[in-house]
Amino acid sequence: MSEPGEEPVAAPAGPAPDPVLNELYGSERPAVELLPGVPLSPIVNSCWLPADAKAMLAESWIPVPPEDAGEEAGPPPPAFEAAAPEYNELVRRLAKTAPFRKWNELTIQAKQLEQEVAGLKGPDAEAKQAELENVKVQIADAEAAVAEVKQSFSDDPLSLTGWMQALTDLADGGMTTFEVSGQGWPYCSLRQLFGEMPSAAPPAGFFDGVERVLGTFKRRYEKERGPGSVQLMLKLAPNVFSDAWSTGGAPAAVAAVEAYVERARANVFGPDGGVTPEGVPEPLDLVQLVWWDFAAADPLPVLKALQRMATDQLQVDEDSGEVSVSEPKKIRGIGLVDFPADRLKAAIQAGVPITCVQVEHSVLVRSAQPVLDLCAKYGIKVLARGGTLGGLLSAKYLGAPPPDPVRGDADLDSVPGCLDAVNNVGGWARLQAALAVIKGIADKHGVKPETVALRWQIDAGCFPLVTTRWSSRVWRQFGYEGWSSFEVSGGRPGVDGPLFQVESFLDVEDVRALAGLAAVHLGPKAG
């Protein structure tokens, strides 16, 4: 406190707001890091593929006219017709690229310098003119970089496909963190989970496809926006039931982890990528361990193998005493999926550095609270699934009958999975009552019901995992229909800004009403 007559001492400035969230939503929320140098967006996109990965990666936005049977010619060049939606999207995308932003910044700087030069004479004018010439050289370099990025749209048939644009829209909306996901047991076959042959390593087909799709997106997006613009959370799900696992012990665990990491790096970085200009392997952002049965096998050997791969291996020169990296780390961080509190504590006590834990935790399901308490104690981030109950906590389903599992519903993660979740929280009538409360709170604050459910997770200290919708439905998971059209959205993200503010819009009355909706308080499942 300052003495009388003294100038008041200014309070120390807090962390600066995240520039993207501030620009899009007027948010003062500071940027958050998953790990040092690895951002974590407020909402994490959980990606289930809408189609086979091979088919998605074979798509092309480039129109190909019918072939003339009388002539043999190579593929026609892309035609950027001004009326084509792809052309409009290309222009918008190009304007957001790092090279274009740099060119724009330098152009403004050059104009300012030209004005300053006009008012100077002698040595001052010469110095300022030299500065201007240097900026002009940088502008020429930036123009070349812009031209290269523009050409890359023509060279990359995936660059303007619907699925690529959907992921781009989400990242442009400030949600730059993506997680591999998909329907698990019992909604997929055991063969899909564990492959044809008993093996300790997970089959290439389970998360392999979504890894390749997200890896392709990451490489494309970072070509436009710069390195580190997208973060990927991967999953390792070993087959703990196989004979190879039970008899192999720790060596089998190490071999399985190493094989998985190498395959995942190829999926994410491409066959020729994943190496820095200095020749150092680029590490994966995060690997989350999925453990099917804690009674069948102990996850600790796998966690220790992951820990080793998340640590630079060092060597000391006997003569000079200098320390150098003999084996760079292959992953940056380790996460856990659905580990109960006792297993999480065992991993922590074993010295495994856990970055984050993924659980189901929502306004209706609070069974993971012991895990949240432990994470708060040790500074571990929590990723929360189930915020919108697979998409059911939406105005669309208020007063509606249950969805038909035969007909399906594109606005839900999985109709069978959602119906099972409804049964777990007390049935359709119980869901309708809860949805009416949530809708009332949403109307009170001028937001979508999905926003209320997700904000509750954020206020609980979690980072919500929201399942991605695709193409024209890209913003449907946040309650916005038809928002992929620029004419409808005006280029604004289809998500309510109050989700990203520091202060919650939920008041005391809202919190009390939502507290009464909890339907599941049982202990977390081990698996």
UniProtKB/Swiss-Prot annotation:
Which InterPro entries does the record cross-reference, listed alphabetically?
Answer: AKR_Detox_Biosynth (IPR050523), NADP_OxRdtase_dom (IPR023210), NADP_OxRdtase_dom_sf (IPR036812)
The yes or no answer to whether the keyword Coiled coil is present is yes
Q: Where in the cell is it found?
A: Cytoplasm, Cytoskeleton, Flagellum axoneme
Its EC number is 1.-.-.-
- The enzyme's first-digit EC class, named in words, is oxidoreductase
Region Disordered: start-end pairs: 1-22
The highest taxon in the source lineage is Eukaryota
- How does the record describe the protein's post-translational processing? Asymmetrically dimethylated at Arg-191 and Arg-366 during flagellum resorption. Probably methylated by PRMT1.
Which residues are annotated with the PTM Asymmetric dimethylarginine?
R191, R366
Q: Where is the signal peptide?
A: none
Q: Which GO terms describe its molecular function?
A: oxidoreductase activity
Keywords, alphabetical:
Cell projection, Cilium, Coiled coil, Cytoplasm, Cytoskeleton, Flagellum, Methylation, Oxidoreductase
GO CC terms for this protein?
Answer: cytoplasm; cytoskeleton; motile cilium
Q: In this entry, which stretches build a coiled coil?
A: 101-153
User: Family assignment?
Assistant: Belongs to the aldo/keto reductase family.
Query: What job does this protein perform?
Result: Flagellar radial spokes contribute to the regulation of dynein arm activity and thus the pattern of flagellar bending. They consist of a thin stalk, which is attached to the a subfiber of the outer doublet microtubule, and a bulbous head, which is attached to the stalk and appears to interact with the projections from the central pair of microtubules.
| Name of the protein in its database record | Flagellar radial spoke protein 5
Q: Which organism is it from?
A: Chlamydomonas reinhardtii
